[in-house]
């Protein structure tokens, strides 16, 4: 064989083998059509915080090139450097009416849309892809920093600014946070970050964690990272066991069924160590918008207040990704309806389709109606060939259309695609008007309640429906008219719209103010005051004078009626009414509070007075008389909380002290009567008066001693007032553009609730002052803040009471304030902070704010767009934090004064019991008509009830607060001393045993030490009973098991013919506490121990556990320090500890599985085979 022939044959063989391989590869080469087919690329928002999210939206169509099988559109972003973007892994199908024509794949490094062969059947293709990405600013700096990341698709690009906040100097002790990793969108990561500053703690640390719906705990992912004096890392199945061994006394309890984790760390190990417990939850509901995790903490940092069950909840929003495509298929009519000016799609436009010749269109219908969807698209498929007419028959207001215009088109059997058309509508210049509603009050009440108006419209059938997007208007006291602006005058048919209002509550629910009736008539609402609820006080005069034996009984007596201690009426009572009296038509309430009525009697000569309720008994005691004193408080119902719980008064005889004193308090209705007084001295009539012994700070005292039957001691206190002044500053180059308004409205908020508004003008040099404001509310200082109603073209900045308005045409600002309606956090349920988000025209902006005490629960967003698509933007807020037990109401009426109110009704309880008599059915007739039962809250007397046979000797204290500052109140009962009876108290059952000559005494211990905050309270104390000031040797131990109370029984009632007075003294000296003993009533002796917390000594560092082989500390050099709440930093997979002994089973398995490398490898072997064949043939040829 010729050598050249051999070479030629080998070449041909090689060419035949290789050529098909390369041709096959070229047949499936995909095109990147990003530059030709992408029409727009945007991000929203355009500025985010480090670790925050933004939404990328890319739109495309086929106007610049037909889209084919295998074509791709790519979106790229920076994946390294100081600023980078990470996508969240998602795959979203692209469908047309249920048929998939491609898919969008989002990865951490980019997004790609790939089309399949089904897209080639479509024409007029347009679509979009929308997905979230995370932005990171990795600049190594402690100062604030902005970095710009550019996202591209073909020749389109958009920028997002990633802001890194200034590093803080302090941290919170505990917070709960979470996130979703870009590469793992099927799980949520959660972090419990405990003792972040490695502080010394005074108590054990307890954390409770409850995973909410839509997710399930994956225990295999749990790991614990400890830094500090006992640094270590625990992960895997044995993480909890290893941790508990290393930290004796610690406990981590996991309940997979309930989705809960409970953590306890002893005080010793909790000090100087920081703990981060990290785990993942598997998402079980992919459609859920957000995932919530609730957590509570109990701890106490050294020198700080104890935290008991404070909530630390966190929400992670699900990752959103969406994509869509539109096109026409054969036999399909598709209409796109859009705004002529803005090109925005118009929904709810109705069209009528018919054949030109009037024949059936399809399905035996000669006319078919189609309506546009939210994307402005209306379509119908499978139309037979023929000539058609499309007519628009209805469009939403304010769009106009020509009812007579026809849109003809033709469908042919030879067509490969359907018919697509775009129809544009212009907005009509709509007639608008302002609608005003009026409030009419009929009645005498000076202070009117706050009510709300909701606007409705009425059709021809008298059906009423709420006006869409009309604000609920608030009418505070003094406001009688409200207006809605720019409302349409006519409906879509040109008929005038009839507007009317209804009276509602803040939530928009129908309501009527308490104490009023209402009448709604169009745009006028009239509230008529109901007749004032009245009561009557009746009683009788009883004479104990042997039927006026000595003829001393007067013809009449004067009975005085006192309302809350102040004399308001007097009646002369005579025998004509059988000595009975009645005060009628008395107001039952004063400013919503029930009036306490009592009676007294002007002094009756030769008689001693005894008052029992409204029964006044006069006993003929020649030579004796009585005197009655009443305390009257004039302090605006104790507004500032300065009123004492009791005061002491002394009786004077002709100006000289008698030594006879009395304690006046709520339990005796602030009144007392002295009996058995000498009527004369040295032949002269004695005048009895009173003086107040208790000096009440801040009060002035006036004593009315005119009538010793009605001595009145008035204590007057003028509540403290304050004023709030400030100024309006204009930053607008001295009103250069003439946009400054003539006035602005400044709102005053008291504890977050708007109470007053002032119009501020240039006449006062733009300064303002709210005067005569109450400084306190129920004893607690009021926190005043100011806001401002929105000022067009200006951005507002509030610093204290200085309000600066900067002229920023096209920009505006929004201010939010949190208002708590929870009785000053009585139950301790209020969180330390809440998170709110700003909305623009009903859509979330991603702009959030944390509201807490440090910023007075208020925040202002500045630099906001004033308009969007030529329309004024309305900014509102929504609360992101779900506060358990609270209802939320958001007042979005004015974006300069957005108010989020959280209302919580404190829990109440009741204490009921009964009085049992052990006296042989009152054999000796000594049983009193009534007894006084005292209610003690945590050892302190708070209420007293008179118990009688009318209630079968049963009693009940209702509507009692269940908690005080978040701690459950311990209620107990005692009883005022009952003569000739011994008292035994078992829970709330009070038994009185008739023991003539014997009595009893009850002592209760009251602790005033902030619920034993510093742990100094002893477990028990010892008290001793005293008889007339002398120790009896009778002692008692008081502790928790006996509710810190004890009763001595079988005590002598008299000694040497005189009534014995029993008192107590405390034998136990409690270090750091001061002791006060209230010995006023031996049925209710109270020993109070008060403790003022002191700063503890320098703590001793705990020793490290003496484990011989502690776990090896992993290398965390690459670990990112936890960021503050709501900014969880990404922890790379490489940061997790690895077992270096594990090797891959097969190194080849680690190689990328690409078709090109397989082909190259195969070609290499073909070459070797051919070369071998060539050498064999050549050898034979040569031989």
From Swiss-Prot:
Coiled coil located at which positions? none
> For site (Autocatalyzes isopeptide 728-805 formation), what residue positions does UniProt give?
788
Q: Where is this site: Autocatalyzes isopeptide 176-293 formation?
A: 209
Location relative to the cell: Secreted, Cell wall
Instruction: Tell me the leader sequence span.
Output: 1-29
Q: Where is this cross-link: Isoaspartyl lysine isopeptide (Lys-Asn)?
A: 176-293, 541-618, 631-715, 728-805, 818-902, 915-992, 1005-1089
Q: Does the keyword DNA damage apply?
A: no
The feature of type site (Autocatalyzes isopeptide 631-715 formation) is located at: 692
Question: What mutagenesis or variant effect is reported for residue 175 to K?
Answer: More than 90% loss of collagen-binding
Q: Where is this site: Autocatalyzes isopeptide 818-902 formation?
A: 879
Q: Compositionally biased, Basic and acidic residues: which spans?
A: 1101-1118, 1127-1150
Kindly list the biological process annotations in GO that this record carries: cell adhesion
Q: Which GO terms describe its cellular component?
A: extracellular region; peptidoglycan-based cell wall
Q: What is its main location?
A: secreted
Where in this protein does the record put region 3 X 187 AA approximate tandem repeats?
533-1093
Autocatalyzes isopeptide 1005-1089 formation, annotated site positions: 1066
Lipid bilayer topology: Peptidoglycan-anchor
Residue ranges annotated as motif LPXTG sorting signal: 1151-1155
Q: Which residues form the propeptide?
A: 1155-1183
NCBIfam families named among the record's database cross-references = LPXTG_anchor (TIGR01167)
Q: What is written about domains in the entry's comments?
A: Composed of a N-terminal A-region and a number of B-repeats depending on the strain. At the C-terminal end are features required for surface targeting and covalently anchoring to the peptidoglycan. The collagen binding activity is located in the A-region.
Q: What is this protein called?
A: Collagen adhesin
